[in-house]
Amino acid sequence: PTDAYQGKLAAQLVTRSTGKWGALAGMPIAAGNLFIGTFDGSSAMADPLGATHFGLPLGQKPVRFLGHYRYISGGNVTGKDGKEIIPVRRDIGQIYAILYETDDNVQYLDGSNITTSPNIVARAMFTGIKETEGTGYELFDVTFVYEKPYDPEKQKNFRYNLAVVFAASERGAYFE
């Protein structure tokens, strides 16, 4: 249960141990996450990064990405063996949005290329996550930075997808 910045509901994302089964599979933690897109559960064990399909079509040019968050770190980052990674560093969450172009070869981005794909047109990466006191919310307000020209014709044809990602652990996709 959690409170909300506004209204009655809020998403609470928590990184948890996956227990013995997850550890045996090399996936000792599961980071709580919320994203726009789909998840292919049938391929999650064999290809966890490929199972997450980020983004949905967008018919407008995004300018800003803003909202509110509250964050309490889960502690120090651990590796797939459950031991702290050296040098020791504190876990931190992620908040970002990616606008990318779809084409005949790229219908979606996944966990392996969400921040590296050549199809990325613009990014809004919030890098200022800080731990809060546990009450109250912090504002994030990020301007989209365009890396490629925006094409209104592609917009009309819904050739742009928008991915929005919130993750409790920055390296959660890699089970760290």
Predicted ranges, named:
Residues 1-66, 88-176:
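Aromatic (Trp/Tyr/Phe) and Gly/Pro-enriched flexible surface segments
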Residues 69-86:
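Short amphipathic, basic-aromatic surface patches that mediate peripheral association
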